[in-house]
Amino acid sequence: GPGFEMPVMILENPSIKNLYDFQNARHRRYTLSSGACCMRFNQPGDEIQKSVNRIQSFEGELQVSEYRGRKQANFMIEKITYQ
């Protein structure tokens, strides 16, 4: 309910299948090998140049979004840790 803080989760060593930049690389969607979708909004400029192969973990929260009647779980990335 209102005021309830979502738990922060950490995905260690994510197996990234592909990524997609949108809105002039301000935002990025990572698709994991499992099919899970991870979203990074307002990514810092220095992250754009870093290799996805060096990503150690994603930190964020799980959210359910609905678009045109279709519900989808997304992991909303708040922080990326690199090796």
Q: Residue locations for each model-derived region?
A:
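Acidic, two-metal ion nucleic-acid-processing modules in DNA metabolism proteins
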Residues: G1-Q83
